């Protein structure tokens, strides 16, 4: 019985790991649409107090504030009934969007959770495109500055 439960947990975990990179790639692609030539993972991960995994404290600048707002948007999404399952949640759910120039369009065919997450990512990508990037806020000491 214990082996059956363990197998079920591992299969759910494996499914989440398969889906997660796709969801992250979509956000990355959205940022690349809004900011052509950008390198989202290397530029925005571990930037300020909120960009990257987790986040707390006070944003260090406008760009970091974009990440704080994005985190809050995902928190709101988790309260939607349609975003509460293992697969349909902000961190693993994929959605449909298109890019025309630097214009990001979330598909009208997205379901409720997908639409909400797509719009969270869209708003963040647009916010990133308008915020100045300060190299001094990359890989900061979060204990001291956040």
Swiss-Prot record:
Secretory calcium-dependent phospholipase A2 that primarily targets dietary phospholipids in the intestinal tract. Hydrolyzes the ester bond of the fatty acyl group attached at sn-2 position of phospholipids (phospholipase A2 activity) with preference for phosphatidylethanolamines and phosphatidylglycerols over phosphatidylcholines. May play a role in the biosynthesis of N-acyl ethanolamines that regulate energy metabolism and inflammation in the intestinal tract. GO terms for cellular component: cell surface; extracellular space. Residues 1-15 form the signal peptide. One of its GO terms (biological process) is fatty acid biosynthetic process. The active site is at residues 70, 121. Pfam families: Phospholip_A2_1. The keyword Disulfide bond applies. Disulfide bonds join 33-99, 49-146, 51-67, 66-127, 73-120, 83-113, 106-118. The keyword Heme does not apply. Its cofactor is Ca(2+). Monomer or homodimer. It is found in: Secreted. Activated by trypsin cleavage in the duodenum. Can also be activated by thrombin or autocatalytically. Residues 16-22 form a propeptide. Keywords: Autocatalytic cleavage, Calcium, Disulfide bond, Hydrolase, Lipid metabolism, Metal-binding, Phospholipid metabolism, Secreted, Signal, Zymogen. It catalyses: a 1,2-diacyl-sn-glycero-3-phosphocholine + H2O = a 1-acyl-sn-glycero-3-phosphocholine + a fatty acid + H(+); 1,2-ditetradecanoyl-sn-glycero-3-phosphocholine + H2O = 1-tetradecanoyl-sn-glycero-3-phosphocholine + tetradecanoate + H(+); 1,2-dihexadecanoyl-sn-glycero-3-phosphocholine + H2O = 1-hexadecanoyl-sn-glycero-3-phosphocholine + hexadecanoate + H(+); 1-hexadecanoyl-2-(9Z-octadecenoyl)-sn-glycero-3-phosphocholine + H2O = 1-hexadecanoyl-sn-glycero-3-phosphocholine + (9Z)-octadecenoate + H(+). Belongs to the phospholipase A2 family. This is Phospholipase A2. Ca(2+) binds at residues 50, 52, 54, 71. Binds 1 Ca(2+) ion per subunit. InterPro entries: PLipase_A2, PLipase_A2_Asp_AS, PLipase_A2_dom, PLipase_A2_dom_sf, PLipase_A2_His_AS.
